C-alpha cells in the first residue's frame, strides 16, 4: 500500500523511529524479568544444578521476595512502554511532545527495573536514602531510590499530558498517524 500523501512529513518518520525504539526498550525490560527469574531460581536453590543431584552452591544476595519482584516487576514496566508506544500514535500528540513523553516513559520503565534489582540488594529495599524502620541505607538504596522517584514524578506528568491529548485536545487529528494504523486511508490494516 502506498501513502496517498506524497508529501508526508518527517514527523511521522520520527514518531515511527521513536515507537520502534520504545518497543525495543520495552522488550529489553521484559528480558530483564526473565533474567530475574534465573536470579530467583539460583537464590531459592542456593546455586545452580548442573545435573540431577549435583548442585554448584553459591550465595545469591537479596531475598526471595526481592527476586520475585525482579522476575515480575520489569514485565509491567516493559508493557507500559510498549503500550504507550503503540497507543500514542492514535493521539494528536505533537512530535516534540511525543519525543519528550516517550523518553520519560522509557526512563521511568528503566528506573523502575533498576529499583527492583538495586532494591533487592539494599537493606531498606531502596525505599529511602537514610536509615528508617525498614533498614539502613547503602549505595544500592541510592541507586534504587533516586531514579525511581525522579522519573516517577515525571511520568505522572507525561501520562497526564497523554490523557489531555486523548480526552480534551480540540485539535484532534482526523487522519491516522501511520499507514498501518487501523482504518488508515479508508482501508483495513496490512
Residue ranges of each PLM-predicted region?
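Short, membrane-exposed interhelical loops at transmembrane-helix boundaries
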Residues: 127-143
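Cytoplasmic juxtamembrane regions at transmembrane-helix boundaries
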Residues: 88-110, 171-190
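Cytoplasmic juxtamembrane interface segments
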Residues: 2-15, 77-101
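Hydrophobic cores of alpha-helical transmembrane segments in multi-pass integral membrane proteins
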Residues: 23-45, 65-88, 103-121, 147-163
Amino acid at each position: 500500500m502506498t501513502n496517498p500523501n506524497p508529501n508526508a512529513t518527517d514527523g511521522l518518520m520520527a514518531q515511527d523511529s521513536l515507537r520502534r525504539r520504545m518497543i525495543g526498550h520495552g522488550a529489553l525490560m521484559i528480558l530483564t524479568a526473565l533474567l530475574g527469574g534465573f536470579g530467583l531460581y539460583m537464590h531459592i536453590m542456593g546455586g545452580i544444578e548442573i545435573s540431577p543431584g549435583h548442585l554448584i552452591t553459591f550465595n545469591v544476595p537479596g531475598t526471595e521476595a526481592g527476586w520475585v519482584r525482579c522476575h515480575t516487576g520489569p514485565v509491567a514496566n516493559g508493557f507500559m512502554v510498549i503500550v504507550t508506544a503503540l497507543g500514542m500514535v492514535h493521539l494528536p500528540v505533537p512530535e516534540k511532545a511525543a519525543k519528550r513523553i516517550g523518553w520519560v516513559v522509557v526512563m521511568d520503565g528503566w528506573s523502575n527495573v533498576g529499583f527492583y534489582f538495586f532494591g533487592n540488594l539494599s537493606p531498606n529495599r531502596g525505599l529511602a536514602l537514610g536509615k528508617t524502620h525498614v533498614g539502613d541505607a547503602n549505595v544500592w538504596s541510592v541507586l534504587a531510590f533516586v531514579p525511581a522517584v525522579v522519573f516517577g514524578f515525571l511520568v505522572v506528568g507525561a501520562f497526564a499530558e497523554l490523557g489531555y491529548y486523548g480526552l480534551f485536545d480540540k485539535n484532534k487529528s482526523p487522519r491516522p498517524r501511520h499507514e498501518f494504523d487501523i482504518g488508515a486511508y479508508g482501508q483495513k490494516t496490512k
